[in-house]
């Protein structure tokens, strides 16, 4: 559960930095405090945010290449930043299985966007996964001749880095709560029920 929370917080952070023009470091601190996540989840969120920011050129290049019918700047904010988080995981985190990164992104798309976004995210990430598997010589159902990924997956996590501030961003002095993504009441109720069903009685996550 801590990694799901970390991904949610990373999404919220990139969303606030993107829409609210907030410094990534400030947005991350605010999101972590706002959602009261565990230290493990906060650490994972920090890795995702810093990695996505540091490798944004490569990540966005892959999004533009794979989403040929979309202008990246006009893509829905949730979709764009979900893809940034997931593609960072897929390209730069060898310790995270490709399917795990994809499935988590799909679930977050369902929570914070809709089924259409989930299908869109699945299509983009599925294509990238096929390319990465082909580059490693793994079996895939994709046809031969698929274009190679812009950057092959590395074998070690990306080095830690300080989030790169947006030169055009206006530093916030108070929490900008209007830029936080809100899940729908239906999704919130569904997720709450699912968590209650999957959480063993008397067991709390450390």
Curated annotation (Swiss-Prot):
Belongs to the NusB family. GO terms for molecular function: RNA binding. GO terms for biological process: DNA-templated transcription termination; transcription antitermination. Residues 169-180 have a biased composition (Low complexity). One of its GO terms (cellular component) is cytosol. It comes from Heliobacterium modesticaldum (strain ATCC 51547 / Ice1). Keywords: RNA-binding, Transcription, Transcription antitermination, Transcription regulation. Transmembrane segments: none annotated. The keyword Cytoplasm does not apply. InterPro entries: NusB-like_sf, NusB_fam, NusB_RsmB_TIM44. It comes from the Bacteria. This is Transcription antitermination protein NusB. Residues 135-206 are annotated as: Disordered. Involved in transcription antitermination. Required for transcription of ribosomal RNA (rRNA) genes. Binds specifically to the boxA antiterminator sequence of the ribosomal RNA (rrn) operons. PANTHER family: ANTITERMINATION NUSB DOMAIN-CONTAINING PROTEIN, N UTILIZATION SUBSTANCE PROTEIN B-RELATED. The lineage of its organism: Bacteria, Bacillati, Bacillota, Clostridia, Eubacteriales. The gene is nusB. The keyword Transport does not apply.
């Amino acid at each position: 559960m801590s990694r799901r929370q970390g991904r949610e917080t990373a999404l919220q952070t990139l969303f606030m930095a993107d829409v609210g023009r907030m410094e990534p470091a400030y947005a991350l601190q605010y999101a972590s405090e706002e959602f009261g996540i565990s230290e493990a989840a906060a650490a994972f969120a920090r890795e995702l945010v810093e990695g996505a920011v540091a490798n944004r050129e490569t990540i966005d290049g892959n999004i533009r290449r794979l989403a040929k019918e979309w202008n990246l700047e006009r893509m829905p904010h949730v979709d764009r930043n979900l893809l940034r988080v997931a593609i960072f995981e897929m390209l730069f985190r060898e310790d995270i299985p490709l399917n795990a990164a994809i499935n988590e992104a799909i679930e977050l798309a369902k929570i914070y966007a809709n089924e259409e976004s989930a299908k869109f995210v699945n299509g983009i990430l599925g294509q990238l996964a096929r390319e990465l598997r082909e580059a490693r010589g793994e079996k895939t159902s994709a046809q031969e001749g698929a274009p190679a990924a812009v950057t092959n997956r590395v074998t070690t996590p990306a080095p830690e880095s300080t989030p790169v501030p947006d030169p055009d961003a206006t530093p916030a002095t108070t929490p900008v709560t209007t830029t936080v993504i809100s899940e729908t009441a239906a999704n919130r109720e569904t997720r709450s029920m699912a968590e209650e069903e999957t959480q063993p009685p008397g067991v709390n996550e450390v």
